[in-house]
Amino acid sequence: MRTNSILSSLRTAIFSVVFSVCLGAVSEAQTYNILHNFGGSGHDGYAPLTDLVLNGNTLYGTTASGGTNGGGTIFKINTDGSGYGIIRSLTNSPSPEGGMVLIGNTLYGTTFTGGSADNGSIFKMNTDGSGYTELHSFSATVPSVFGTNSDGNRPQGDLVTDGSTLYGTAEYGGTNNNGTVFKINTDGSGFAVIKTFSATFLGTNNVSENMLVNSGTNTDGARPIGGLVLDGSTLYGTTYHGGISNGVVFAMQTDGSGYTVLKYFSGINGIGTNSDGAAPVAGLTLGGDTLYGVTVGGGVAGCGNIFKLKTNGAGFIDLHDFLHSDGAFPRNALFLNGSTLYGTTAAGGSSNYGTIFMILTNGADFTTLKNFDMTVGLQCDSKFVLSSNILYGTVADGGTNGGGVVFGLTVQPQILTGDGNFGVQANAFGFDITGISNQAVVIQTCTNLGSPDWLPIQTNTLNGGPVYFSDPQWTNYSGRFYRLRSP
């Protein structure tokens, strides 16, 4: 069980020393469990690149390669790691790289390649593996695989749905080869392109994470990789190229009207840095009237950042700049729980294989929860899903067989040292506690860590935001330690 301990004392100097030891910015004692190692025997899948779908106690996902035909797989696994099975081996090398969406007992998704022109497709299938149907095949591009067409090419963002219509993005293709936003009914009818991104005019190219950050400018953005967010009749998304320099955040209506750029990301200098981030590869996360996202480049160290802005485009704030030591190049959408954001980076951290992190929505208390390495997996390419207090995701590489893993991270409650509630207030010593919503937390205390006799002094339930704990008895002790436990 993860334990957070703090010492309260009459002397502030003692506080500072003990807090810096006990509550640093790395919290590696989270419980990380590998549920499945890909790349094993029996034509197993390889390289899971997409988000998982949770239905009850069952997780569904895809791999980009492997399977009987080498074209990737669709799999299921229970949240306790049992019941792993491939429910579909894909043919013709379609390589699914976008997350699926579940409606009833039907899964809907996209493939990056495959289809009649090998430019990707939209499919559906039942959760038992039956009824696989190709709903749309993206058309041929001229003059080459990365040329132009009418409907888009190479979809890899997650689909979203209002129940009867699916919405998604294609990175390439369209009339200017800068990608499209499309919609299609769940029965395969009514496919329509509702946005074609305009032509870009080439400027100075810069490189971040071995990819071009600036491939030209236009007014509306270019190359949408991430999935969309649907709120009522409004879609929100990102492009990692175009705009005035390095991508945009946009909003539009589901009928294709009202396209608006909410944020233009600025240019980067010769060493890849700027003030607001560059190249948002991932999709957005919506919380109330606020959008949260990440960029893969730019920021103060050229390693990307975490940002937020209002749904009307106002109030852009850089919440955190990655420094490589705490992670680098975040490529996946954030997961929001209460007032805490959880996410991953593709590189950086102690082993340079990426990290799992948490941060409050106000930018406080950034914490590294897990450093990836070859044994536990590397290159996390999925947004989290939550069950109880466990975050589930996939890693595209590493693990026992080198084919990536499905993992679960048990998130323990955290004591927040970076906000204004930490310390002595109204003659009581107190602090904020954060964690997964509806998680019960017991605060225990003792006076001697050499022979601790931990006593429970309060139980709280986390409900959508930090819970404040205060100890009015702190002045009765020369020193007091605190820790958090589950009941």
Which residues are covered by each model-predicted region?
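Short, composition-biased motifs enriched in small/polar/acidic residues
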Residues: S5, V411-P487
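Extracellular beta-propeller repeat domains
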Residues: R2-G420, Q425, I436, P466
